[in-house]
Amino acid sequence: MSSDFTKEVDKDNIAIITWNCLDKSMNTMTEDGLRSFQQLLTEALSDEKIKGIIITSGKVDFSGGMDLSTLEALKRNSGSDPASKIFDYIMEAHGLLRKIELGRIDDTSKSKPVAFAGSGICAGIGTEIGLACHRRFLSSSKNS
C-alpha cells in the first residue's frame, strides 16, 4: 500500500489526512495512492471518536492531478478491453469523492464534516477532492 497519504489525529479528535508523494516534486494520484486514501478516509469516517476530517498536502502545491503513467499502466495491463479497466478505476475514484461529499461510509452511518486545506496548484483529481469537501480553506497566494 502506498505511503503517499498519512493520517494523524490531533488532540481535538480531528483526523488530518495529508497527501505527500515523497518521491515526486508534486502530488499525483496513483492506483495505490487512491486505495490508500480510500482506506484512511474510511478509517476516519468509521471511528466514532473522530469529529471531523481535514484533507491537506505536505507540499507547497496540493496536486498535479492523476498520474498519467497509472492510466497508461491500466491500459497496458487490461488486455483486450482497456476502456473497461480505466472506467472501473475512474468509478473507484468517483466512489471516494462521493464518500467525501456525504461525509460518511454508507446511509446508516453518521455524517462528519470534511474540510479541504490547500495551497498552490490544484489540478484534476486534486480539484475534485477539494470540491467534494464541505468547506475549503485556501492560501491567499495568487497561485491558489
Residue ranges and their predicted role:
Residues T28, S63, I125:
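Residues that form or flank phosphate/diphosphate-binding pockets in enzymes
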Residues E48-K51, F87, K112:
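Short coil/turn segments at beta-strand junctions that form active-site/ligand-binding loops
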Residues K99-S144:
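Glycine-rich beta-to-alpha active-site loop
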